[in-house]
Amino acid sequence: MGRAFEYRRAAKEARWDKMSKVFPKLAKAITVAAKEGGVEPDMNPKLRAAIAAAKAENMPKDNIDAAIKRANGKDSADIKTIFYDGKAAHGVQIIVECATDNPTRTVANVKAIFSKNGGEVLPSGSLSFMFSRKSVFELNKPTTDIEEVELELIDFGLSDIELEDDTLYVYGDYTSFGTLHEGIEKLGLEVKKGTLQYIPNSTITLSEEQMQEVERLLDKLEDDDDVQAVYTNIE
C-alpha cells in the first residue's frame, strides 16, 4: 500500500514540537474524539488512540485530562471536523482535515493559503473517488511472527499490514476502526497511534524541484492552527 497517505507527518511533528503547536493539535483531537464517542476511553477506541498519540509525544496527563473534560464544556459544542479538497501544481491532490469552532474563519484561511501558494480549493467531495478512507494504526514491532498477527487481525477487519523499521502499520476500512483496535489490543500489541486517514488510490512522483515548490503550500497548511492533517497523492 505504501505510506503516502499523509504529508511528511514525522518531520512536521518535530517542527510543530519546536513551534509549541503539537500539544494544541493533539488536545483538539482528544476533545473531538471524546465529543463524538464519549469521555470514557474504555468505551471509545478513537479516544484511546488519541490519548496514545498524545502520550507518545510526551503530552502531560493534566493536558490530556483537560482536553477530555473540554468535550463536555460549552466551548466544545461547536467544534466540528471539516474536510477541504484542493489541488496544487504538478498533479498534486490534497485533502485537508480541520477541527474548528469557526468554519467561516477556517475556510477563509484555507482558501487564502491555497491561492497564495499556487493551489486551488476544489468543491467538496471532488477527490472522494481518488482517495479511500481507512483506519490506520501504528504499532511497535511485535515479537511474534508478522504473518500470525496478520491472520489474527483479518477477522477484526484488517485489509493490509506493513512493517517499516520498528513500526508495524495496520490498515482497515474506516468502518472497522473500533473492531480492529479491539483486535490489536486482544493480541497484547501496543497502539502508538490510531487514526482515520485518506489513502490515495494512486500516487505520483515529483522531482526535488517540484517537491520544493509544492512544499511551500503544504507547510502553510500544516502550520494553520485548525488543520489536523494534510493528505496527498505524493509517493
Curated annotation (Swiss-Prot):
Gene3D superfamilies tied to this protein: 1.10.10.200, 3.30.70.980
GO cellular component entries: cytosol
Cross-referenced InterPro entries: Integrase-like_N, TACO1_YebC-like_2nd/3rd_dom, TACO1_YebC_N, Transcrip_reg_TACO1-like, Transcrip_reg_TACO1-like_dom3, YebC-like
Location, primary (coarse class): cytoplasm
Alphabetical UniProt keywords: Cytoplasm, DNA-binding, Transcription, Transcription regulation
UniProt key word Transcription regulation: yes
UniProt-listed GO biological process terms: regulation of DNA-templated transcription
Subcellular location: Cytoplasm
Gene Ontology MF term list: DNA binding
KW S-adenosyl-L-methionine (keyword) present: no
NCBIfam families recorded: PRK12378.1 (NF009044), YebC/PmpR family DNA-binding transcriptional regulator (TIGR01033)
Entry's family note: Belongs to the TACO1 family.
Name the record gives this protein: Probable transcriptional regulatory protein Ccur92_05350
Species: Campylobacter curvus (strain 525.92)
